[in-house]
Regions:
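Phosphate-binding glycine-rich loops and their immediate beta-loop-alpha structural context
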Residues: 200, 209-227, 234
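A short, basic/flexible loop-to-alpha-helix module at the beginning of a structural domain
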Residues: 194-206
Length: 339
């Protein structure tokens, strides 16, 4: 199906496969259409329908509160073309940068499914063919029988790798997490689309790294840290990691974090700091993760790039600290927040 998108700066033409969402078709064609979550929760990918017919794959998407259906607006991540379309988006749109990892559809097999805590599960997804991705990116996942994708960041880093590592936190009423926690999913098949996301790191950055993560938002940070460690990045630059959880029983990847060359602090929001732990290389503080980071980072923000991930309230609170207290410019704050 032919789709024409008219942006503020120019127009683009691309084809969508049968059943393919407009956003995914455009990204697959190498066009950097506007998006954030790519799953219907944020509203960033809204467009105005000029001509043609669109099927709404998720009429109840939270992101629909940001669109005006009566004005022809819809979410490209949930819109499926039923005939040739002409659309308008209000932002400037450019082709993906040369060398960027172009999102594609693929599928894979789950293996090594294991519990990290009472409500966090980890697994690897073995892909049918190798895929490139940048440290800090995410993909969209969907098992058979569940409509729609869910966004999850990779924990590992490997260009041309055939395995992606994930952590998933159980969410009451969440279709994917209930499916995952409901049975042994070793050997299950997942459809995937990606990689996506701009909260990425590469060793040529030349800045000190600050990572602030709440809960399973740590996943993308682990990918960034793996990339940095492989390049011996912390021999030349400083690094700080702040990992927020409610209690010690909610913490995971502590062994992996204890081997990171950056300074790592675990923030406990609902429990006092334990008197002694087996993790002698890690620091533990009481408080919300953005508050702990604010106290520890005072006066240390020179030449810093910050990465933030986690539940939307935690991400918003951390961004306020980085803008108002740290005085970081917006180009030095990279974040992902998934609802």
């Amino acid at each position: 199906m032919r789709i024409q998108v008219n942006a503020r700066n120019r127009g683009y033409d691309f084809d969508a496969l049968p059943g393919e969402r407009v956003l995914y078709a455009g990204l697959r064609a190498g066009i950097d259409l506007p998006y954030e979550c790519a799953t219907g929760t944020c509203g960033t990918c809204k467009a105005k329908l000029v001509s043609g017919r669109v099927r709404d794959r998720w009429p109840g998407a939270p992101g629909r509160k940001y669109v005006k259906p009566q004005a022809g607006e819809f979410l490209m991540c949930q819109g499926e073309a039923e005939e040739a379309l002409t659309l308008e988006v209000s932002s400037f749109v450019y082709p993906l940068e040369p060398g960027a990892c172009v999102p594609q559809s693929c599928s894979g097999t789950m293996r090594n499914v294991r519990a990290l805590t009472h409500d966090v599960t980890a697994f690897a997804l073995d892909l049918e063919r190798p895929r490139d991705f940048d440290a800090g990116q995410f993909v969209l996942l969907a098992p058979e029988g569940i409509d729609g994708y869910r966004a999850y960041s990779m924990c590992n880093y490997a260009r041309g790798g055939r395995s992606l590592d994930f952590v998933v936190k159980r969410k009451a009423g969440g279709a994917f997490s209930e499916w995952l926690f409901g049975a042994n999913r070793d050997g299950a098949r997942l459809d995937a689309f990606g990689p996506l996301g701009k909260a990425t790191f590469e060793p040529g950055l030349g800045k000190n790294l600050l990572c602030i993560a709440g809960g399973s938002g740590l996943a993308g940070m682990m990918s960034i840290l793996a990339r940095a460690e492989a390049a011996n990045y912390f021999e030349r630059h400083q690094g700080w990691v702040f990992f927020g959880v409610r209690t010690m029983k909610d913490a995971f990847f502590l062994q992996e974090l204890s081997h990171v060359s950056a300074e790592v602090t675990v923030a406990l929001s609902e429990e006092d700091v334990p008197r002694g732990t087996q993790w002698s290389k890690l620091r533990f503080e009481r408080g919300l993760v953005h508050e702990v980071a604010k106290r520890a980072m005072a006066g240390k923000y020179q030449n810093v790039r910050a990465y933030v991930a986690g539940p939307p309230p935690a991400v918003d609170a951390a961004i306020r600290v980085l803008l108002l207290d740290a005085k970081l410019t917006t180009d030095n704050i990279r974040y992902d927040k998934f609802s």
